[in-house]
Amino acid sequence: MSYDQLPERLRKTCLALLLAMISPLHADLAANPSFLDERFVTLDDWQPMTFPNIKRHSTYSIHPCGDKTCLLMESDNSASGLLWEKTFNVYEYSFLKWRWKVSNVYRQGDSATKEGDDYPARLYVLFNYDPEKASAPKRIKYELAKLLHGQFPPDSSISYIWDNRETTKPFIVNAYASEARMIPVSSGSAQVDTWQEYSVNMLQDYKMAFGQDPPPLASLAIMCDSDNTQESAKAMVDYIRIGSVP
């Protein structure tokens, strides 16, 4: 028997039960449109993110910004980042907004090469790996990575970057990893040392860069690096927000 063939009273009862099941989710999202509102008063919720064989690390500190504080990121022939370890559902909280500025871009920076893969500022969205949904070759690859590093690497990532060179490309495949796609939100030196604000839809950007839907769970990381170019830069981050509305 189809839904349309049910008695009217029973159809109304089914509809009421369905609405009762989904309304708490909608009410929760409406009451909590913002999952993260990071104003960088402290770095208590952020953990260092370092890389094997890179001994010189970038530095991250809370810095005065007028009547408030910001995150100061400094890199001098170095690389490391900050990881926000909490996870969120990107289908429930699809919108990412932030404000930053950089002191300069890198003369030797080139997103097409490993030697030029440095950026004065980048904001990562790291999507969790799910072994139950992975192909057999991918499971083997990720199990080996877990043996080496103690945990699974991200399934994939998108990173919003300040590209060193002027570009109109909607996204760039990272020179080190095809699972990492970079989206230039600013490029070149025309706007250095000025605050730039961005608002993006992570779901749409992932689909644009990968041609498919993303895994549901993700976390954030932020970085200023210069180990490949051996140059230096500073960047400041005013805030980062994740929410269910733009």
Describe each region flagged by the PLM:
Residues 85-96, 189-192:
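Extracellular/lumenal carbohydrate-interaction signature centered on repeated Trp-anchored short motifs
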Residues 44-68:
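Extracellular glycan-recognition surfaces and repeat-rich motifs
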Residues 220, 240-242:
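Extracellular beta-strand elements of beta-rich domains used
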Residues 28-53, 136-137, 141-142:
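Extracellular carbohydrate-recognition regions
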